[in-house]
Amino acid sequence: MDVLTRFNSGKLWDFKGGVHPPERKSQSNQKPIRHAKLVEHFYIPVVQHAGEAGNILVKVGDYVFKGQPLTQGDGLRVLPVHASTSGFIRAIAPYASAHPSGLATLCLHLEADGKDQWREQQPLDDFLTQTPEKLIEKLYQAGVAGLGGAVFPTAAKLHSAEKQVKLLIINGAECEPYITCDDRLMRDYADEIIEGTRILRYILRPEKVVIAVEDNKPEAVAALRQVLQGANDIEIRVIPTKYPSGAAKQLIQILTGMEVPSGQRSSSIGVLMQNVATAFAVKRAIMDDEPLIERVVTLTGDKVRHKGNYWVRLGTPIYQLLQQVDYHYDDRFPVFMGGPMMGFILPDLQAPVTKMTNCLLAPDHFEYAPPAPEQSCIRCSACSDACPVSLMPQQLYWFARSEDHEKSEEYALKDCIECGLCAYVCPSHIPLIQYFRQEKAKIWEIQQKAKQAEEAKQRFEARQARLAREEQERKARAQKAMEARRQEMKTAQGIDPVQAALERLKAKKTDNDSSAKVEIKTIVTEKGDILPDNSDIMAQRKARRLARQQQTQNTDVSQVETNEENKSTDSKSAVAAAIARAKAKKAAQQGSALEKDEISSSDTLSVGNDTEPVAEDPRKAAIAAAIARAKAKKAAQQGSAVEKDEISSSNTLSVGNDTEPVADDPRKVAIAAAIARAKAKKAAQQGSAVEQDEISSSDTLSIGNEAEPVADDPRKAAIAAAIARAKAKKAAQQRSAVEQDEISSSDTLSVGNETESVAEDPRKAAIAAAIARAKAKKAAQQRSAVEQDEISSSDTLSVGNETESVAEDPRKAAIAAAIARAKAKKAAKANNHDA
């Protein structure tokens, strides 16, 4: 049997459980509905329904008219809110909310200007001229929600049940004690309720429409029947008074005897229910173009002097509303929103009135007693017996306390209508309804998180699919463009570029295959292993390494020879300068008597086989002195520390074909040195004017005609150096005592039994002396340990039987000197090891 058959039978059914609490409705239903005074400040929450908040359309400082939308949603479940009066938006901020938690919610602070000026309205004379879809959209824009307590968006409810409804029920039962807003609304505005009911019938097109009213409201029933005047399109049925007969599922069961399946809506069995206050709001929204900005609120309780029902603008602070009815605040007695069974205590009286505010109850000590202390459950099953939904509240209580959400869902906690009967009958005074509400909130939060995660997953998958699709489209476009370019090239050149590239690749591969493969040499080890033969590579590496080592050795030898040549050149320059200074000093003394004897005696000295006289022209001596000074200055910068030793030893060397040793008499050496110094001093005084010319011409002079290198026998050079060092040392010790005597007697001394005059060419003698000094200096540094042996053996050796001039080739002399130095160093090292 379907729902219509059961309804048409005219029978009323009963539901399980239920109670008959004291009604106390007469306190507030005796007077018609009055209008509450407008307050100065309204706090309009952006969420006043079962859903989410819309987008705010205004900003601080904006002026708004009465009925102007303040928010706008993007779906039928996101209802807009409207300005309760005209004025200015002063703030958009959190404010106290009418909720058991007392949490703040976002509100629009509207300051009224007192004009209460409507926005432009467009009333509708006949709703039959509009389509149901347009009427649903208009209800949505008006912000109409269920005013029976659930505040579910009416437009969404109608849209979801369209063309599925067989029975439309207008709920006028109002079973909650103390609440009389629906009763007075049916009495005072029955015609508008009937008009709203007909609009709903036009939208839903049900087969039957019924207005259900409890039998404790005879005045309301009479008012409705009077408006209908015998019309049969809407039926009125009076039901027995029993709590909670006004609940949707219980009222359906009373009228049809059918229960709504668990977890489903009433539309699943072809039934839709709306509250009488909602029908009234539908009529105002469709016909009068008035959004939902006010509702009827019951103000009752012994703490309220002027009890009754009032039209209250949404957003009115509750405390200011209670003050209008002469409410006496007492912190011992709370104020309830809703009735004593399903209502809750307001944590803050500054909270505003919203769409769900149907009653404000302010009891005194006769009506309210503090809740008794909670005791342990005694498993009496009174709650189960009273539950109109046939649940097991005691089991749900344990699940809620242990937060066993799965068990709570398994025991159908979601079917609980929160009527409060279980707590009302509990002998242990357990606030079961509070536990169930908290458990529902936790489960809802978990489900929301899961829903958000699923939505995020779907968005991610959709994004991945979109990216993959875009990638495929991009590849397809690239392939298409490539094919187009290929076709263009083929058309222009007559050759397919892809085919040509493949042919080139094939030809290249053929060439590589036909080329000779590199033979890899291998060797076989004793164990029979085959390894690559790297002997050629190793030989090449060894050759490169030896070449680098040889290059390094050649560089070192050339560097040593260069250093030795530089030292030899510097020593020769210093020796030549010293001899020149001595001769210049002697030449400067030519004007005196001693000078003449020195000159005459100097003619008897012979240096070698030279034939050119040096002292015949004193200008030559001056030139030589200038050259000597230039060289001496340079030598002084490089070796000032050894200058004196070089000068003192310069006159002790044998220059020519001497038959006797030059230094048999050390006095002769000292005399020669003194003469050289005197001549150098005089030449320095006379030759300053011609110094530059002398220096410029110094490079053109010849060193001599030496016949053979001094170092034909390197041992002779070493012996000569040793003799020179010994004589120089001895002469240095005697110079200080006999210097004056040596100078005075210098004219009468003979240097040796020489066969030719020494003064014929003094430059040759200077060269020979410089060579000897350089050798002596080198040998002195290397052979200090064997100096005495060399001196003792020097007397038995002959220096030379030289028949040719030493200075014929100065380069040969330098080479001989370098060789002599190297051999002397080697001999010194050998002697040191022997010692």
UniProtKB/Swiss-Prot annotation:
GO function terms (MF aspect): 4 iron, 4 sulfur cluster binding; electron transfer activity; metal ion binding
The source's superkingdom equals: Bacteria
- What is the recorded name of this protein? Ion-translocating oxidoreductase complex subunit C
Needed cofactors: [4Fe-4S] cluster
Description of how the protein assembles with itself and partners:
The complex is composed of six subunits: RnfA, RnfB, RnfC, RnfD, RnfE and RnfG.
Q: Where is the composition biased (Polar residues)?
A: 552-561, 648-657, 745-756, 793-804
**Residues bound to [4Fe-4S] cluster 1:** 377, 380, 383, 426
Matching entries from InterPro entries are given as: 4Fe4S_Fe-S-bd, 4Fe4S_Fe_S_CS, Ion_transpt_RnfC/RsxC, Nuo51_FMN-bd, Nuo51_FMN-bd_sf, RnfC_N
Q: Which Pfam families match?
A: Complex1_51K, Fer4_7, RnfC_N
> What is one process in the GO biological process aspect for this record?
electron transport chain
What segment(s) does the record annotate as region Disordered? 468-492, 540-574, 586-618, 634-666, 682-714, 730-762, 778-811
Listed binding positions for [4Fe-4S] cluster 2 are: 387, 416, 419, 422
Per UniProt, the cofactor note for this protein states: Binds 2 [4Fe-4S] clusters per subunit.
Q: State the organism named in the record.
A: Pasteurella multocida (strain Pm70)
Cell location: Cell inner membrane
Where is each 4Fe-4S ferredoxin-type domain found? 368-397, 407-436
